[in-house]
A protein has these predicted regions:
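Conserved hydrophobic/aromatic pocket- or pore-lining residues that grip, position, or stack substrates
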Residues: 14, 38, 253
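Terminal helix-turn-helix DNA-binding modules in bacterial transcription factors
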Residues: 8-25, 44-80, 107-126
Length: 301
C-alpha cells in the first residue's frame, strides 16, 4: 500500500467512526504503519495533530446539528465524546466562539472544519541533500517547556520560551564553552503536545560538580540521555534566520523523501542542531547560520 492510500484510508476510517470512541492503534492500522509513525507523519503533513483533527471535525458537525434546532445539547455532547455538558460547552465555545445554546438561535455564525482528503500534486524534481547516520548515545543537559499540539501557536511558544529563559541558556553556554551551537530536543509526543528542550553537551568536569556549583538553580535543568540509533540528517539553507525554514524542511522530508525511502519514523527524540556563528559586522559569517534536523528512523518492515 502506498503512503497516500494509507493515510486516506485512515482518514476515511475516522470519518466513518466519528461518533464512536476511536482507538488510535486501529486508525494507524488502516495505513499499515505504527501509531507513532502515523501520528508524527500526519501532524507534520497536515499541520495539526490527529486529535485536533478529530476534535475539530466533531465540533464542526455539532454546530450543524445544533443549528438545525432539533438536537439536544446533552445528546450532541455525548455523540462528540464529552462526558458532561460543561466540558462540551467549553470546547464548543473555544471552537465556534459562541455557546451551544446560542448556536441554536436563528442566524448564529458558526465555524466549519471540512473533511480532509489527500490529493496527489506533482511536486519535487528538486534535490534534497541528506545523510543517514548511526549516532552514538549522548548526554545533553537542558531545560524544557511543554508545547501545545497546535502548530499555529508553536512559533509564539518557541519565541516566548527562548526570551524567558536567557539566564538558563547563558549558564549552560558558559559551562559547555560552546557559544555558536545549540541543541533542541522534542520528545514525549502526545495528543496534547510534546516536551521541547534547549540543551547543551557538558564536559565531565561540569557534570561532576553540576549540583554543587549551581545549588537550587540546578533544579531547573534535566539531564537527557539520548539513545544511540539511526537518524536521517537534513540541513536548512544558510541564511540569517534559518529557524524559520525548519517546518518547511520537515514537511519536505515527509512528503518527498520518506514515502519512497523504505524507512519509517521510530519512537525516539527528534533533535535539532542550531549552528549560529556570530561576528560583529561580518555579513558572510552572520548569513551562514543553519539548522540540522535529526529525524529518528528505522527500516520499514
Amino acid at each position: 500500500m502506498d503512503w497516500i492510500t494509507g493515510i486516506q484510508r485512515a482518514i476515511d476510517y475516522v470519518e466513518e467512526h466519528l461518533n464512536e470512541e476511536l482507538d488510535y492503534d486501529d486508525i494507524a492500522r488502516q495505513s499499515a504503519s505504527s501509531p507513532f509513525h502515523f501520528q508524527r507523519v500526519f501532524s507534520i503533513l497536515c499541520g495539526y495533530t490527529l486529535a485536533e483533527y478529530v476534535r475539530s471535525r466533531r465540533l464542526s458537525a455539532a454546530g450543524l446539528k445544533l443549528a438545525s434546532g432539533n438536537a439536544k445539547v446533552i445528546d450532541v455532547a455525548m455523540e462528540c465524546g464529552y462526558d458532561s455538558p460543561d466540558s462540551f460547552s467549553k470546547a464548543f465555545r473555544a471552537f465556534h466562539g459562541i455557546t451551544p445554546s446560542q448556536a441554536r438561535g436563528n442566524g448564529a455564525m458558526l465555524r466549519s472544519f471540512s473533511r480532509l482528503n489527500i490529493k496527489v500534486t506533482l511536486e519535487g524534481g528538486n534535490e534534497m541533500q541528506y545523510r543517514l547516520e548511526e549516532k552514538p548515545a549522548m548526554l545533553l543537559t537542558g531545560y524544557k517547556r511543554r508545547f501545545s499540539g497546535n502548530p499555529l501557536d508553536k512559533g509564539e511558544q518557541d519565541h516566548n520560551f527562548a526570551c524567558e529563559t536567557r539566564v538558563e541558556q547563558y549558564v549552560l553556554e558558559g559551562m559547555s564553552r560552546i557559544h555558536d551551537t545549540t541543541y533542541t530536543v522534542m520528545t514525549n509526543f502526545s495528543d496534547s503536545g510534546y516536551d521541547f528542550y534547549y540543551a547543551y553537551p557538558l564536559p565531565k568536569w561540569a557534570l561532576d560538580d553540576f549540583e554543587d556549583d549551581l545549588g537550587d538553580f540546578a533544579k531547573r535543568y534535566t539531564h537527557l540521555q539520548i539513545p544511540a540509533g539511526l537518524y536521517l540528517v537534513c540541513e536548512t539553507e544558510r541564511c540569517m534566520f534559518p529557524t524559520a525554514l525548519v517546518d518547511a524542511l520537515r514537511r519536505r522530508i515527509v512528503t518527498e523523501w520518506l514515502p519512497t525511502s523504505g524507512y519509517v519514523l521510530r519512537n525516539a527524540p527528534e533533535i535539532g542542531v542550531i549552528h549560529w556563528p556570530f561576528e560583529d559586522g561580518n555579513d558572510a559569517v552572520n548569513n551562514s547560520h543553519y539548522v540540522e534536523i535529526w529525524l529518528p528512523v528505522s527500516k520499514a518492515e
